């Protein structure tokens, strides 16, 4: 069972949420974007109302599922906008189905594979979530926001935690296992025939800003930098909407 929404007319735009999120993360953006575009939101495998497929959800598995939805909807080409893990899925999709891509936005995401340190962190997370599911989720979500915003956005953070707590344990572990073994896809940033936009947060606690700049050196990728954390869709909502609308105008 795959949960998705499809509304509006125009260029097809697929919104892909991140780890511990679901399609509700886009709700502030849809009313504006749907005025000029056909907006598809999808719950990724083991997240939201989409069921688990197995015990490891690779980025390719997720991409195949997205392709299946687009095929159902008879959509040949789409712009993919992915937050964090959603960006990894967008790049896996671009590798598997290059002819179906019209443009990509990587929001608080990276084309690079996990470092050894990140892989070890994923393994620790798998142990932690099995030991104490709710404490793991509450801590993980708070840590995605820049420290300066944790008080200002306390209500939103609480809401995000409640959405995250809907994610089944199997889905969480399968996503962590899948992200841990994902391929490096930096080559796509160098050779893609369509526009790509990278959106980074200066104070992203999860993705080091300076390390992430390196991947776009010598590419045509457009960079937008926000001053905040990993959750631009909440921390920099108005500015992000402007960036996304501008990108969609250009494709």
State where each predicted segment sits.
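Conserved HGGG/HGGXW glycine-rich cap/lid loop of the alpha/beta-hydrolase fold
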Residues: 3-55, 59, 69
